[in-house]
Amino acid sequence: EKILIDHHQEPQKEVFAYGISNTEKSSTCEMVYDFIVESGNSNKLNTTIAQCLYTGVMTDTGSFRFPITSAAVHKMVAHLKELGLQHSIIHDNIYDNFLESRLRFTGFVLLNRMDVLYEYNTAIMSISKRDLQEFNIKTGDTEGLVNYLLTIEGIKFAAIVIDREEERKWSFRSKGNFDVNIFARKHFEGGGHINAAGGRSSDTLNNTTAKFYEVIKEYQQQLQ
């Protein structure tokens, strides 16, 4: 039987025998930690488990800077530290361990593929297969790229579409109360959270990008 532990909006609960979904939690790893503690199994937590739980929480909270990061999250991390967690090593392995080609790719797409739509407080980036091949970029190397767009002053909505072999993959991020989960579900067969979601398209890169430019017009007032 399948058991669901999830923090996304509208999970497919019907395919699980048991489960819980809590969108107020920062991550599934926080929920797993709560389950271990509340079931009276805190004594089974060790350094290896602590590393896994910390990794999930750190990445899902944007290194603890997203609004979903609660006091409970910090208390959890404090407990994991008491178990011997070396958090800086995990951070270095995930965020400070990239190949030179990835950094050059990031600079290239920020310079050549980013479009800032100030009338919608939105930034979008469209990345082709050729771009990926030129820098030998693999799946996962584009993780977090969408967050760069939100560092622009005044930008409330960021979107990246990447031309993968099987389909076009969208990543959406937002600030404030603009719900990218609703946006992704309505327009790009996706979903996720209020401020972070994903989507997909079986259309061409040019066509799905053009669709974004068209539908964003519906949200100008919300994004002011």
How does the language model describe each region?
Residues 62-187, 192-224:
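Hydrophobic helix-and-loop "lid/oligomerization" segment in the mid-to-C-terminal part
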Residues 1, 39-44, 133-137, 166:
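Short, glycine- and charge-enriched coil/turn segments that flank and shape catalytic ligand pockets
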Residues 3-5, 18-21, 123-125, 159-161:
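Hydrophobic/aromatic beta-strand patches that form the interior of the parallel beta-sheet core
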Residues 7-76:
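Short alpha-helices
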Residues 1-6, 34, 200:
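Short intrinsically disordered, low-complexity coil segments enriched in acidic
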Residues 1, 15-17, 53, 120-121, ...:
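Short coil/turn connectors at secondary-structure junctions
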